[in-house]
């Protein structure tokens, strides 16, 4: 067993860049351990991930704000505080804040993350209309 004591582990909040659009900050809760990584992620309005998938899936727990999650080939689904999302292994998706709200979620990522192309402004607008 390991216990990770929040900010005591010395991890700093990180500005996320090349695999995100807009301003996104991640606060590492648990470093990659046994193929599991946990981050609290803050998205400014309209900010979002690129398309990606996870080798063993991902769990999102929305803690504040409003946002969207979109699976390839489908319309985006709204996210609100209190929502929990299970994304199966290798399912291509993106998630991020609504255009008029920030979004804060805890991301529990299982296995390797396969980062892909950016979600364009037109794709974001079309999926969330």
Question: Where are the regions that the model predicts?
Answer:
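Short beta-strand His + acidic residue motifs that chelate non-heme Fe in jelly-roll/DSBH
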Residues: 49-51, 69-70, 92-99
């Amino acid at each position: 067993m390991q216990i990770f004591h929040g900010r005591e582990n010395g991890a700093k909040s990180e500005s996320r860049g090349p695999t995100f659009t807009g301003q996104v900050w991640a606060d590492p809760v648990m470093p990659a351990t046994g193929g599991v990584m946990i981050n609290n992620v803050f998205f400014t309005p309209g900010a979002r991930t690129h398309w990606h998938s996870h080798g063993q899936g991902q769990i999102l727990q929305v803690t504040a704000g409003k946002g969207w999650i979109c699976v390839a080939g489908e319309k985006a689904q709204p996210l609100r505080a209190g929502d929990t999302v299970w994304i199966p292994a290798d399912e291509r998706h993106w998630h991020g804040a609504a255009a008029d709200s920030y979004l804060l979620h805890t991301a529990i990522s299982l296995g390797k993350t396969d980062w892909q192309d950016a979600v364009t402004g037109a794709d974001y607008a079309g999926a969330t209309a």
